[in-house]
Amino acid sequence: MRYTLQHPEQINSLILIASSSVRVEGEKEAESDEDECSPLAWRLLSSNFTRKILLVFTPKFLAEQGLKTSIYDQDLATKEWANEFHELVLLEGSREAIISMFSGDRYGNETPEIFKQISAPTLVIHGEEDNLIDVESSKHFEENIPEVAVKIYSNIGHLPMYEDPERTAKDIRDFIDTIR
């Protein structure tokens, strides 16, 4: 998102999936560190010390727990799928990217009006049952990006591209077809 705002001339279109917007005073923060229901990994990421450890050592059980928290349909939270997620986390650069999202204040002092600067056609996809990023954050995109389509999927959590890949792919294809 930051790149889009800093380099609008390089962006032809934008697709945001389960994306956070900005912090708004009084709004529920789904990914709260203090939330007892949040996965252990999220709580560990709130500490500089444990972030450094997680850069080199990421236990598989954290991927399992994170997966269970991320999806709505718990039947999808299989060991095989958790293993795949763990393998993705171990890819070069993945841990650094994940940890950077939890380092410092991702939101800054920006207000939702900053999204009015986005001129590229934008598709926003969000699961209504997302436990990590409040689905209400998508309303900031809808209210402020001039050319935006927002798709909210019912009975879907934080990972619509895994929980309903066919629908997600169709919506992305349809979006791309409209901007050609």
Show where each model-derived region lies.
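Conserved alpha/beta-hydrolase catalytic His-Asp/Glu region
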Residues: 26, 51-117
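Conserved hydrophobic packing residues within short motifs/helices of P-loop NTPase cores
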Residues: 15, 123-125, 151
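Short beta-strand/loop motif that positions the catalytic acidic residue
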Residues: 118, 124-126, 130
